[in-house]
């Protein structure tokens, strides 16, 4: 694989993984809030 391809793809992969990480963290937070609300009711 050409090094130029890596230079082009690296920022895209980093941004994609960062977005997935943030979405996953937000989803876990929402699930935890939902479970906590379920216990309080």
UniProtKB/Swiss-Prot annotation:
Its main location: membrane. GO terms for cellular component: photosystem II; plasma membrane-derived thylakoid membrane. It is found in: Cellular thylakoid membrane. Keywords: Membrane, Photosynthesis, Photosystem II, Thylakoid, Transmembrane, Transmembrane helix. Disulfide bonds: none annotated. InterPro entries: PSII_PsbY (IPR009388). The keyword Transmembrane helix applies. The keyword ATP-binding does not apply. The lineage of its organism: Bacteria, Bacillati, Cyanobacteriota, Cyanophyceae, Oscillatoriophycideae. It is a single-pass membrane protein. It comes from the Bacteria. Belongs to the PsbY family. PSII is composed of 1 copy each of membrane proteins PsbA, PsbB, PsbC, PsbD, PsbE, PsbF, PsbH, PsbI, PsbJ, PsbK, PsbL, PsbM, PsbT, PsbX, PsbY, PsbZ, Psb30/Ycf12, peripheral proteins PsbO, CyanoQ (PsbQ), PsbU, PsbV and a large number of cofactors. It forms dimeric complexes. Loosely associated component of the core of photosystem II (PSII), it is not always seen in crystals. PSII is a light-driven water plastoquinone oxidoreductase, using light energy to abstract electrons from H(2)O, generating a proton gradient subsequently used for ATP formation. It comes from Gloeothece citriformis (strain PCC 7424). The chain crosses the membrane at residues 5-23. This is Photosystem II reaction center protein Y. One of its GO terms (molecular function) is manganese ion binding.
């Amino acid at each position: 694989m050409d090094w130029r391809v890596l230079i082009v793809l690296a920022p895209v992969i980093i941004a994609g993984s960062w977005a997935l990480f943030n979405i996953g963290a937000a989803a876990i937070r929402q699930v935890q809030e939902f479970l906590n609300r379920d216990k309080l009711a």
